Amino acid sequence: PPGSLEELVHDRDGPRIIIQDPRTSTPGLGLLLWMRKVFGTDDQAAWTALAPRIVTVTKGWSEAYGLFLKGEAPMVLSYTTSPAYHRQVEQNNRYQVAMFSEGHYRQVEVAARLSTSSEPQLAQNFLRFLLSDTVQNILPTTNWMLPSVHTGQGLPDAFRDEEVPERMLQFDSLEVRDQRKQWISRWLTALSR
């Protein structure tokens, strides 16, 4: 696999890839932000360079990963924790993460209490429950993600072999809020050429 996002984008003979739409998918949005973080204002040119090897852009992760598992492309935008699922559930070590030298964009699943909630205390209690050891200990093998907080239990064996990105990339949330529409527009323009 490619060793960097730069290599993935600019290697004309590189692997074909399935990605998700940043308008409908948080991993797709993560890729959009990742490209912007690595390539800056050259992101549109990077998307144009990658476009010929994009097999399809799916609405969500499930559709993309399903196509990948059916052999539609040798590479898919997924989570660094995806191989743990295959190791634990299928006893299959075939699937690997492509670690990129520039770093990886941080994917965070969120839960929040709305200011307009009619049950603010119930919502707060639920958020506390989500952060409890009970829930955090089951997340790795139910949602196949790393927990938000460390618990005394540690991670299941399937995660012990996981490669962890050395560098995590992330934009300030206010910048994403202010620039997202423009960045998506640039993505649409690049992929429609």
Please state what every model-predicted region is.
Residues 1-73, 86:
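Extracytoplasmic ligand-binding site segments that recognize negatively charged/polar headgroups
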Residues 6-9, 36, 65, 69, ...:
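Non-transmembrane alpha-helical segments in soluble domains
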Residues 15-24, 47-51, 57-58, 90-115, 129-153:
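Periplasmic-binding protein-like
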Residues 23-26, 81-84, 103-105, 118, ...:
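Solvent-exposed loop/turn segments at secondary-structure junctions
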Residues 36, 107-120, 138-141:
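A bilobed periplasmic-binding-protein/Venus flytrap-type ligand-binding module shared by bacterial periplasmic
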Residues 69, 73-94, 143-144:
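A ligand-binding cleft/hinge motif common to bilobed small-molecule-binding domains
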